Amino acid sequence: MKEILPGIFSWHEFSEEKQLNFNGYLLVLEGESVLIDPPGMTEEAFAKLGSLAGKISKHPLQAILLTNVHHERECDEVRKRFDAPVLINEKDEAGLEGKADKTFADGDALPCGLMTFKFENQKSPGESAFFQKERGVMILGDALIGKVPGKLNMLPPDKYRDSKLAKKGLSKLLDYEFESLLVGDGESILMNAKEAVKVFLES
């Protein structure tokens, strides 16, 4: 687990099947913290998480946020260890293998200064982004992935009912001002990320 931006930590688990890193994120801000899409963790990573976001730390973990129904990953184990609730968009709750403690809706405010919004026509009906306006950071799950450093892609067309409509739905990202884009799968873009989104959408 390493700090990739001020107050934002990341770790990953490599997927042999997808040949990509599955990324998780810890956001720390003003006395609280949240985890997003946590993949598998080593005991060393759990220890680091405890020092940063444990109950007696300066930034106790407030929630485990899932961008979509397919990113449950290690959330049950983290919930057990840290007694933190799992949250997912209300449209994806029914598809979970486990159980969410709470749901959120399009436009809701979440801990650590995050706001969430939902994309239309994606792989799952509740595919969501988390936006931290103060830091200019956008966090995605499967909406876009980073197969190649500095570039963005969608999932394969067979993952959608209509890949053209799915791509059109991503134009919602252009309504927000962000410098960094953190993705659930592959390589994130830490600078000039909105421009990379524009390039992809125009391709």
Q: How does the language model describe each region?
A:
Residues 45-46, 74-76, 97-98, 149-150, ...:
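Short glycine-/acidic-enriched loop or helix-start segments at secondary-structure transitions
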Residues 4, 15-17, 32-41, 55, 59, 77-126, 133-135, 160-174, ...:
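Metallo-beta-lactamase
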